[in-house]
Amino acid sequence: MARRSVLYFILLNALINKGQACFCDHYAWTQWTSCSKTCNSGTQSRHRQIVVDKYYQENFCEQICSKQETRECNWQRCPINCLLGDFGPWSDCDPCIEKQSKVRSVLRPSQFGGQPCTAPLVAFQPCIPSKLCKIEEADCKNKFRCDSGRCIARKLECNGENDCGDNSDERDCGRTKAVCTRKYNPIPSVQLMGNGFHFLAGEPRGEVLDNSFTGGICKTVKSSRTSNPYRVPANLENVGFEVQTAEDDLKTDFYKDLTSLGHNENQQGSFSSQGGSSFSVPIFYSSKRSENINHNSAFKQAIQASHKKDSSFIRIHKVMKVLNFTTKAKDLHLSDVFLKALNHLPLEYNSALYSRIFDDFGTHYFTSGSLGGVYDLLYQFSSEELKNSGLTEEEAKHCVRIETKKRVLFAKKTKVEHRCTTNKLSEKHEGSFIQGAEKSISLIRGGRSEYGAALAWEKGSSGLEEKTFSEWLESVKENPAVIDFELAPIVDLVRNIPCAVTKRNNLRKALQEYAAKFDPCQCAPCPNNGRPTLSGTECLCVCQSGTYGENCEKQSPDYKSNAVDGQWGCWSSWSTCDATYKRSRTRECNNPAPQRGGKRCEGEKRQEEDCTFSIMENNGQPCINDDEEMKEVDLPEIEADSGCPQPVPPENGFIRNEKQLYLVGEDVEISCLTGFETVGYQYFRCLPDGTWRQGDVECQRTECIKPVVQEVLTITPFQRLYRIGESIELTCPKGFVVAGPSRYTCQGNSWTPPISNSLTCEKDTLTKLKGHCQLGQKQSGSECICMSPEEDCSHHSEDLCVFDTDSNDYFTSPACKFLAEKCLNNQQLHFLHIGSCQDGRQLEWGLERTRLSSNSTKKESCGYDTCYDWEKCSASTSKCVCLLPPQCFKGGNQLYCVKMGSSTSEKTLNICEVGTIRCANRKMEILHPGKCLA
């Protein structure tokens, strides 16, 4: 056979050579067809317009010319528009500010070029309070009370300094006693050290520490630049002036992609709050310590630049310090504006009011750092051009560092090495390696803005003037920024004010909710293992090395991996409190799940925290001060010569007759929390040796508590407790569907699958897409075409239980995908019932009905379903409803021989009668198809 093929080829080749080769372009191509998809990668084709004429036949055009071409099109991801939830109810009227608020959340951030959300998430309105304003005044005891309510030491009265901030401590003074023998100026820019810092936004916010307060102490520090010392504020432990400009501290770093900026161990910042909610954020650093700029324009600019081509980045940075500082560990003097904001917070938790603290003052404060500036540029290079240059990563970093020393710092002794000017990339740009970069992103901080802007590099520019860097360096001394800093949570500053413990607890709760708004778990997975990051209400994709495009959808020629790394989904809502007064929550590695050898998610799957209870729940939140925070466990233990200490109850259990010490022979009774029942002997007896005689006893869960869901969702059936094995269904108002699974089952100690606290309703995309078309179709101009399972079904739709006749198996499928495939003539799929596949009568009848349907003469579409001979379609519910046996037609070709109930006699029934009897769940045995023989 092989020899015959070779001979045929030789003969064909000889004939072609003998004749004239076909000029295929003689037959023009048609226009490319429209793309099969508008997004998410489709295909289009074109055909050659063949005319079988003499030329075509004589020149073997049939064998030579391709008649059809296909290409990929519209590979960009479908845009996801930002979706805001509805406003919740108005909060109670705050009696102190006479305002109330309502809040809504971002249900879905925008992504892949979708429309962003611009409307506010919080609304305020004036109101008439029904309660008195409960702003507690500080108990100054032996201290002086300022008009503002602040307490200061008595020794600070009449010292000629405004220690109160409102000058009330210097009023009605006969004589004043100066603290210092002469007047000293404050440290330049000392107020910057007292600003708050928003860790999630990566920028300083309002003043939280009053660094004009000196505390009646005359402590000074001297700078080498001036002869006059500066006064040191009371909040600072140490201050040291220095000017650091050494040339050899110029650092360079190489990044194959921007994801390594966020995942490198030495450069990773993580945000955490009380309760353990944490996630990593990409950061840029100055030297040893971290500075987060995740959400500012520089990082966004870098991401957008990386989308245009497969890129690598070289970062060069140099730190110039003017002074170093360390903040005191305790007894810090808060700024008036921050103190006033804290004092006006209500005792009752109000998410909107408490979250404003973080908007205005940030999430952290500076515990140490430096004032100065940072020369910092991030150069973007084409990965392909860097590879073709012949330089290694270390050599490329070295060339950027050497050229920066020569062309920016104008270091006199810098020698440019031969390899940095003669490689293939530098040769294209007159010996300059930096000129081969695509662009640079400026991360310069400190100094006057016009000098900082002049240091930024632009492609094609002639270079910097020699004085540019020195001018910026001088301006850093007058206009420094806080750099190389360390942070502590701003919540730690809430001490020694009225109701400090109550407000600290409320702020921790608010910070946990506030931080969740920045968690990229809300984003859809990015193509090619891109890492999503949330910027405001927009999700951006940070591309892996070897990928690029607006959403990382394009691959460089040498990118071969098809693995999908796992990413965390969002946390579930907190569970109810157990017997140890703790609650927990979980998350799943499913956004996306690891596929084709991809990495598993790093981090914890489950978190646990202590529960808090209000002992005055009906009287509002109590005011607890710092010196009043005591728990029962802090009470001294009672020592006795005989008896037994309190025993440890089983998990999810408690002691009914609880006390600290029990007499010999005394019994304790073990009871279980709601939703649990006692299994075993529930009495312990105190023995003379101080131990307990106890049998095996445990609290086994028997019920799940009704989950907490958003108001727009309806729970069916609605009850307080559900036994193990019971299920609930979540539904939405007409025109909306649940934006996630709708069915949940009580299993073990939780609901399965976990119920997300962000679960809500969204517009029914199926209804919107189909327009005036049938289910499974969408409107395209004036025509109805089948929906694409991949393109049109990326949104959530309700679950259906479906049977596949090819695999002879049933499975749960999204409704949209089922309808789209059914429209595309996928006849092997059969609807069983709404909801996920669960063992039981509904599934059994669905499978039996599918087997019986193969012989049905009637097949009428009805919603998701198809009605058969023994059914009719209900117009009101779009569901198939079984007929009664007398409503069936008589006779017919599809007959069966059956036995009814416990009867031994045989009976012939048609397919309609068989279907109605089995639908009513009456006992019947089908003996064989056709009439009974007897």
UniProtKB/Swiss-Prot annotation:
Keywords: Complement pathway, Cytolysis, Disulfide bond, EGF-like domain, Glycoprotein, Immunity, Innate immunity, Membrane, Membrane attack complex, Repeat, Secreted, Signal, Sushi, Target cell membrane, Target membrane, Transmembrane, Transmembrane beta strand. All cysteine residues are assumed to be cross-linked to one another. Individual modules containing an even number of conserved cysteine residues are supposed to have disulfide linkages only within the same module. Residues 176-522 form the MACPF domain. Residues 780-839, 876-934 form the Kazal-like domain. Ca(2+) binds at L156, N159, E161, D163, D169, E170. Its main location: secreted. This is Complement component C6. It comes from Homo sapiens.
